[in-house]
Amino acid sequence: MVHSISKEELLKAGCLHAGKLDEAFALYRSAIISANNESDMLVFIRRLYSENKGAVFADFYYPVLDAQSQERFRACLDGPQLKMAEAFQASDGQVYYPLKEEWMLDFLVMATARNWLFSTFYFADKKAMLWGNYDLKFPIFCDNE
């Protein structure tokens, strides 16, 4: 099981955060990361993961969606992917998760890149936030320092 953490715990870990995309653009330096395909984007995000080992988080809303929205998402998944989705448990409606294993990252990048369910990725060590996905264009936000 993967247990969620609160927004306060995410911030305490040192992550950047914004409630909306326009807020992120106003608060932080930004760039757009583009990829030709899902595999290329995964390679880039895995690099960020390795440079922030132990300090990577993501939001994942599946556990708090209504039953109909959960069913639509499950319809996109095969058996192993469904088990991955079900591993994420939301405590008290919290949707932030520490990504302690690479399979968690890979699963969330895949779901985001395929437009099934979007996640934002938070990197505490290098202070970056990657917002996905707009036709394989991911806005990335960095601390202004």
What annotation goes with each model-predicted range?
Residues 1-137, 141-145:
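Structured alpha/beta or helical-core interaction and ligand-binding surfaces enriched in interleaved
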